[in-house]
Amino acid sequence: EVGIRKPSIYAHFQGKEDLFLQVARYAFQEQNLRIFQYFTERKEQSLEHTLHDFLFWMEQEYESNNSAKFMLRFSFFPPVSLYNEVLNIVNPFLDKMERKLTRRLRNARDREPFAHMEPADMALAYMTLVDGIIVELLYSGSTNYHRRLNAAWPIFWRGITLISSHEGSSGLNCKNIVN
């Protein structure tokens, strides 16, 4: 309850689109703070547990926090008429999260058994994992979310922590494929 009658709400905003974008910005600011708080509270915890538990935390946020639910839904399903404006909110948020995670991975290198990978690549791989699992939450709910999480997490973690003489032995470098 904000105390604004429906006919007068547009006196505070230029229109429905402006109202939507203001709420979207607010939701992203709130979630940015909550995510920062999540990682700050766990800075002494192992990175494996922090990253793994974040996936469960995101599910809990989606189920219990209206800003998180709104943010995730409109990130994946933006209104067609506001597509570019929504991307101008979503992409900087994701870039910021990627930079923070890269920094966290770089700082954890001395304490964690990482493969010889760039922290930026590991951060991007993790964010891709999060995206894929969240899509399942949005489309299918918690049961399929957990099914995907349980299948993908061990493969991801082994991939970034595997240190062996076979590392890179396939000769396949995906960066070269794109170029």
Predicted regions and their residues:
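Secondary-structure edge/capping motif, primarily at the C-terminal ends of alpha-helices
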Residues: 42, 72-79, 137-140
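Helix-turn-helix
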Residues: 1-18, 22
